[in-house]
Design a protein with these regions (language model features):
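A long, amphipathic alpha-helix that forms part
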Residues: 1-16, 23-66, 116, 216
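Structural motif
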Residues: 15-19, 69, 192
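Histidine-centered active-site/metal-ligand motif
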Residues: 26-30, 74, 173-178
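Acidic/histidine-rich catalytic neighborhood
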Residues: 65, 71-109
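…; additionally, a secondary subgroup of soluble metalloenzymes is captured
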Residues: 211, 215-239
Length: 239
């Protein structure tokens, strides 16, 4: 923040970006389990940096002609060892390559009956399997050759895993995680904005991360490149 004020603001840039320092991922995962004081301390650190930046704009007489936008890339939700689903209870992992995560990808061998695989996985609690062509359109996760043939949506707060992983990692999963269905409120990020291009004193409904690009380009008077955002999102927040 201090560098933005010192080095960039005098040159009147069109756009300045600042990535806030945060907790190392391992500490954040551990802290999120009970929203420990470390998380509060990280928030206070970011808040103090924003306060210095706003004070710097005010001192320089620039507060009312600079748009300030604060965003986060995603939310977090607690996960724990007692909320796990063993994928290997329904699937022979020797016949399937697995991309593990909050959205699981399955690359079955040619000999695997894909429909039967989807049925077996979906029979497990807290998992929903489907062909990539059947992934809900709102997730934009169907039309690329790097997307696995079978996509498994994991219920937020749960972890798809295997017996061998649990044996090798007796303390995991724990803390918090992200990457679940973005319709889940805990996955929502943050969007705060003030400045000459933004409406004042209003609270709008949820925005999607893919909408931020269109909002910023319109505020800057630029024509956006093709993107997955909703152009109407800018109407909700801009003057």
């Amino acid at each position: 923040m201090d560098a933005l004020l010192r080095d960039y603001l005098p040159t009147a840039p069109d756009l300045g970006l600042y990535v806030a320092p945060d907790l190392p991922a391992a500490k954040l995962r551990a802290a999120l389990a009970d929203y420990a004081p470390e998380v509060d301390a990280a928030i206070e650190k970011v808040d103090a940096a924003l306060a210095r930046f706003v004070d710097g704009l005010r001192t320089r007489g620039r507060l009312d002609d600079v748009d300030l936008v604060v965003v986060s890339d995603h939310g977090m939700t607690p996960v724990s060892r007692d909320r796990t689903v063993r994928l290997d209870a329904a699937v022979d992992l020797a016949t399937v390559d697995v991309d593990w995560g909050e959205v699981v990808g399955l690359w079955p061998a040619d000999t695997v009956d894909v429909d039967a695989l989807i049925t077996r996985v979906s029979a497990l609690s807290h998992l929903t399997a489907m062909r990539k062509a059947d992934v809900p359109e709102r997730l934009h996760y169907s039309n690329h050759d790097r997307i696995p043939p079978v996509v498994v949506l994991v219920e937020p707060g749960w972890t798809a895993t295997s017996a061998s992983y649990l044996e090798r990692n007796p303390e995991r999963p724990s803390g918090g995680s992200h990457g679940f269905d973005n319709a889940f409120p805990d996955m929502h990020g943050l969007f705060l904005a003030r400045g000459p291009h933004f409406r004042s004193g209003v609270e709008v409904g949820p925005l999607r991360t893919v909408d931020v690009y269109g909002i910023l380009t319109r505020a800057m008077g630029l024509d956006p490149a093709p993107n997955a955002g909703d152009p109407a999102a800018a109407d909700r927040v801009l003057r």
